[in-house]
């Protein structure tokens, strides 16, 4: 912000009024920058290797979910290690009881989205399947979706993203909830 514009503001923001030397070497700041760019990796017995993405405040990794590799994202405050622990603990609770959560998420998505899947099927001119005589059932819907990613927050909220098996022409099926309240939402994403 230019100095002449900032002078009339009640709260004056920082502004650069002059650059004395461009590209000045500063060993102290260089050391801070190098430390910032060092990778932060956590090894967890349940969740495996998790790497901090400082740009997005997430730890990223892969887990086994019902026999399949699934991406895991832990939403954290990169500057707050307690948030790392809370997010890891929440994710471990999901993973430890994954069969129960997987069935509940699939059933919830099927209950809430099967009608919409049949609506999309009726609009698919290339499909030989008639939703009037051979509709997608809730059981079929639940079996067809494939979990690809789980995102977990420190507070125990989670969102699971499923491949739609082209029932929605490539959109993801998104299922959200929390460890305390259970599954609360299912919709399309992407």
Placement of each model-derived feature along the sequence:
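Contiguous hydrophobic, core-forming segments of folded domains
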Residues: 36-104
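Long, charge-rich alpha-helical interaction segments
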Residues: 81-136, 141
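N-terminal start-of-chain detector that recognizes signal peptides
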Residues: 43-47, 130-134, 145-149
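Beta-strand elements of well-folded, non-transmembrane domains
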Residues: 3, 67, 78, 164-166, ...
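C-terminal structured interaction module
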Residues: 138-190
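Generic low-polarity alpha-helical segments
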Residues: 1-3, 98, 177
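OB-fold/S1-family single-stranded nucleic acid-binding modules
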Residues: 2-35
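Broad gene-expression machinery/nucleic-acid interaction feature
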Residues: 6, 10-14, 58-60, 69-71, ...
């Amino acid at each position: 912000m230019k100095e002449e514009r900032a002078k009339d503001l009640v709260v004056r923001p920082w502004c650069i009024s002059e650059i004395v030397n461009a590209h000045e070497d500063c060993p102290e700041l260089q050391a801070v920058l190098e430390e910032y760019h060092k990778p932060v990796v956590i090894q967890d017995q349940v969740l495996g290797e998790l790497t901090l993405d400082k740009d997005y405040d997430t730890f990223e990794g892969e887990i086994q979910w019902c026999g399949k590799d699934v991406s895991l994202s832990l939403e954290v405050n990169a500057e707050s290690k307690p948030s790392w622990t809370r997010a890891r603990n929440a994710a471990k609770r999901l993973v430890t009881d994954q069969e129960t959560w997987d069935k509940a998420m699939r059933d919830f998505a099927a209950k809430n989205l099967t009608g919409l899947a049949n609506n999309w099927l009726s609009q698919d001119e290339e499909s030989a399947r008639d939703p009037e005589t051979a509709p997608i059932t809730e059981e079929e819907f639940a079996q067809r979706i494939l979990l690809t990613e789980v995102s977990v927050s420190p507070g125990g909220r989670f969102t699971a993203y499923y491949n739609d098996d082209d029932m929605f022409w490539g959109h993801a099926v998104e299922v959200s909830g929390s460890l305390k309240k259970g599954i609360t939402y299912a919709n399309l994403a992407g």
